[in-house]
């Protein structure tokens, strides 16, 4: 496996800046809001003080890669949820879009259930998994919907979309 990774290393992104994203002419993600839903701003959460510098570093990496941008005003505001990886201790900054998710229509074609996929793979000698870390950053958000993805960061880091 290591040999394959080395041989095809140019096929993988090893940091955020190596992920240029798809062209807007090919695909853009839109966030329609169901009727009857009003914009919602979550109250800012507090975090352990030792996490704040690591959150700030991750936000700066996302800014440098142009995955996010500062936002001056947004009607929809969500909180970040910092998640520490058990094995590596690496911090992943997730966003709590629970209010926005309730307001958007459900997909007509939902993702398959993980257990079903694993059961269907039984009998094979090798099963591999890929971590799609930051994969959602590869599809641009339609400009008119970008502010709906706004999130607030603790410690006066700011508001981003």
What are these regions (language model features)?
Residues 1-161:
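Retroelement reverse transcriptase polymerase core
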């Amino acid at each position: 496996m290591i040999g394959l990774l080395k041989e095809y290393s140019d096929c993988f992104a090893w940091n955020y800046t190596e992920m240029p994203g798809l062209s807007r002419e090919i695909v853009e993600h839109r966030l329609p809001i169901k009727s009857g839903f009003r914009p919602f701003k979550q109250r800012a959460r507090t975090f352990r003080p030792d996490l704040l510098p690591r959150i700030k570093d991750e936000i700066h990496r996302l800014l440098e890669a142009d995955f996010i941008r500062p936002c001056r005003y947004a009607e929809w505001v969500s909180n970040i949820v910092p998640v520490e990886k058990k094995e590596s201790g690496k911090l992943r900054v997730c966003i709590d879009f629970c209010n926005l998710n309730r307001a958007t229509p459900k997909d007509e074609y939902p993702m398959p259930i993980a257990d079903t996929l694993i059961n269907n793979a039984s009998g094979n000698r090798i099963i591999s998994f890929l971590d799609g870390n930051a994969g959602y950053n590869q599809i641009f958000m339609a400009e008119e919907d970008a502010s709906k993805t706004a999130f607030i960061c603790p410690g006066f880091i700011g508001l981003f979309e």
